[in-house]
Structures are given as C-alpha cells and as structure tokens.
C-alpha cells in the first residue's frame, strides 16, 4: 500500500526532545534537513524509493542524529521538532525559532 505525500503531511506533528529521546535509544530517529519536506521524505521511505533516500543520505540531507546534535538537544529538552512516524522510523526536523 502506497501512502501519499499529502496524506503524510496531515500526520506531521510537533514534539519535544524529551519525548523523542527514547526513540534515539532504539535507533529509530532520522534527522531531515530543513531543505526537505518531512512528508516527501516519509513518502519516499514508505514507497521504498531507494534512489531518493540514497541521494539524500549521500548529500547529508538525511541521517542519524550526530553526537553533537544530541548533546545540544539534551541541554534543551523542551526543544521543539516537527515529527513524522513512518514505521520503523521517526523522522524529525528542527523547528526554527522565529525572532520577535
């Protein structure tokens, strides 16, 4: 069964780092660069689009959280992320803070 990008877009939610931390422990977190849309990446994973996923991985637009990122996020456990679950993965994207 193929899940559409539009359908996945309705499933994107906001979640804090403290809640996501457990998914890091089991290895399910995948960081998505802000240049990509979570729903687009989720649809590619769900469709097993190996070419797109490999392209994003090789260009650094998609990957596991780095140790530096985890340390930074552990300091601010309330940090907000956009999140999309595409089992077994939890796709996350840092929310940018708007100055105001």
Segments (PLM) and residue ranges:
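Generic secondary-structure microfeatures
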Residues: 34-36, 57-61, 88-90
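Short, compact, well-ordered microdomains
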Residues: 64-100
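Short, hydrophobic/π-rich interface segment
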Residues: 40-73
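N-terminal, charge-rich interaction modules
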Residues: 1-47
């Amino acid at each position: 069964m193929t899940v559409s990008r539009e359908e996945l877009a309705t499933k994107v939610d906001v979640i804090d780092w403290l809640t996501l931390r457990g998914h890091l422990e089991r290895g399910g977190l995948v960081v998505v660069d802000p240049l990509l849309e979570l729903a687009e990446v989720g649809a590619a994973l769900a469709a097993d689009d190996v070419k797109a996923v490999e392209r994003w991985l090789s260009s650094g637009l998609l990957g596991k959280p780095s140790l530096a990122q985890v340390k930074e996020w552990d300091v601010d456990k309330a940090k907000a992320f956009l999140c999309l679950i595409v089992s077994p993965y939890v796709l996350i994207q840092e929310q940018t803070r708007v100055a105001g």
